[in-house]
């Protein structure tokens, strides 16, 4: 998988950057926190390190430094579509580079291969009380999928910290591949007839979600 190869080439650089930052600047204060901020939902507090996103107070969220309009404009799109491949956005998040169409399509193909949702997940959702909130059902389905986690399996078998990212990448791809099917089924369970609609292998991630939701694509 080219995505894994790409990450394998850049992860050591990120690790070295963090190592140097902690060693040389570990005692630098990054913020001061007031009681009002604590009671105000932690708003404005610098408490996380991330390269993926940042919320600009004037322009809104930025993904890898790009505004939403910039992101939508620069990502590869399916033919005759104004909306990019979701696989391209995923690639941008992980790698930090604008993907080629081939990069986006590789992610889309990985998702198609990993999209099967085990029957027990649907059974868990069907067994939940009527009136359960859709987000609770969504969370419950994701928790049920822990049984499928490659990271959990590898962790029990034993692996070094330098290897963590490999099964984490697999788990990330496996989970994101299944989310459209799970979300569409929850929508059907809550607001329609509760039937399950199989994904269409000819459609990309975003189009498949719309298809399973009953939206005309």
Model-derived segments and spans:
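Hydrophobic alpha-helical bundle cores within soluble ligand-binding/oligomerization subdomains
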Residues: 1-217
